[in-house]
C-alpha cells in the first residue's frame, strides 16, 4: 500500500456462525486490495468482547491482514483490560483503537475504573510501552455527548497527548467539517495523522438511524435527494457512490492522510468508491 497514505476497512463482530463466515469471506475479498489494516468494533460496555477477540485473531492469523481491535474502557476493570492487552500482544496484534466506548442501554454515565478515552490511552502505554500503535476517535461534527465544540476539541487534544499515534474520524458528509477540525487541533499543537472515516451510502433509513445515534449530520441536499428516491435502491446506491467518491476526492486532494471505510461487513459499497478513486492495489 502507498507509503504516503493508508487505507483500512472496519468490521463488526456478528452474532451468528453464518454471519461470521460471511464476514471472513468479505475480509478475504477486501484483503486482495492490500489494505493497511482491518479494524473490528467492540460492543457497548464491552458486550462483544469475546466475539471481537475471536474475529480479530482470525483476521490477523488466517486472512493475513493486520487487525486492530477496538478496546473500550466503559464498564471494564483494569484487570479485564490488562488481560485483553496481554492476549493481543501474545497474538502479534500491534494496533489498537482506544475508545471510551458506547454506554449500554440504561447506563446514564460512564462507569468503571477509567471513564475517558485518554485514561485508556495512558493505561495502554503504561502496560505495554510502545508495543501498540494506538488509534483514537475524532469527531469533526462534535461528539453527540459533548457540551460544546470547544470542549470536544480539548478532549481530543487530551487523547492525542496521552500517547495516541493517529486518529480515525466519525463519518461525515461535509468535507469542510473535517478540514476545519484538523485546522483547529493543529493550532492546538496536535500533529498526529487524522484519517477520515467513510460511510458508503446504500440504505437511507439505516443511514438516518445510524446518523441520529452518532451525531453525524446528513446535509439537507443529500437527505432530500435520498428521500426522493424512496425505495429505489439502485438510484440510492448510485447517488451515494457519486457523493462519497466526490467527497473522498476532495479529502485526498486537501491532504487527508488516507481513508478508513466503515464497511458494515459488506465489500462492494466501499470497493465501488475505492475503484472510482483509482486507489492502489
PLM segments and residue spans:
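Active-site-adjacent beta->alpha loops and helix N-cap segments on the catalytic face
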Residues: 18-20, 46-59, 77-83, 102-124, ...
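Active-site beta-loop-alpha junctions enriched in small/polar residues
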Residues: 11-14, 41-45, 70-76, 101-102, ...
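Acidic (Asp/Glu)-rich catalytic clusters
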Residues: 1-2, 27-34, 53-64, 85-93, ...
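Conserved, mostly hydrophobic/aromatic
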Residues: 10, 38, 88, 159, ...
